[in-house]
Amino acid sequence: MTKKQIREGIGLTALNIFFIVLCFVTLIPILYAVSVSLSGQNSLLSSDFSFIPKDFTLDNYKKVIFGEDILTWFKNTVFLAVVTVSLSLLIAVPAAYCFSRRRFPGRKPILKCLVLLNSFPAILSMFAIYRLLRPMGLVNHRVGLILVYTGTMAVFSLWNTKGYFDTIPTEIEEAAKIDGASDIQVVTKIVMPLAKPSIITTALQVLIYVWNEYIYATTFMTGESKYTLAAGLNSLQATEMTGSWPVFAAASITVSIPVLIIFFKCQKYMTSGLTAGGVKG
């Protein structure tokens, strides 16, 4: 081996060690939450920091799994997530294909305007959205929250899928039309299968947003039976679970598991779906 190869090998090894340590550091809060959730001691911060629970118990998870409130909030969140993902993709995918393949007056200004509107933080539009939803009776109603979520994520979905459509060569569609395929057949049998990584990635991003969203959920949902998981966990932490951090930690870990499972199942689509959409978008 040459000196250059040795230096490159040492540098690559050092870089790998650095990223391993960095990953471990970022996992410390999660590992500590897992440790607290498995502990029978009711203490969150103590001088004897340890990742291994001293009084190991699964009672905290039993209280969470068999609690009626958690199940209700879980159902609410799943319903909101499924409907929001479906509506966002139903709106964004056709619009993204149109913006990618068609050239019409005002195309670029519309895209820039959508990005500008979506760049403001959610809290700035909170009062305006509340004033719009209240006269329609959509405050403390799941339909109102679905409209807010869909309007928020449809823009992101449009941009991400449009970027991926831009990477699909138009020659493929032209060749299919020469072979006698109609416009609908080109879209459904050629373009959509090729855009599958981007669509799945976009759907996953919308799902994660709805699952973790807190500001809108706590503002527009005032009834405890209509809380999402994020709003419900906050209400529990602020009330009866204030003195039971292990149960709260167990609840936090439990509600994260479904999204983690879906994420790992769809992980193979994430790289191509995000990078291609980000580069061309």
Model-derived features: positions:
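A structural signal for multi-pass alpha-helical bundles of membrane permease subunits
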Residues: K3-G281
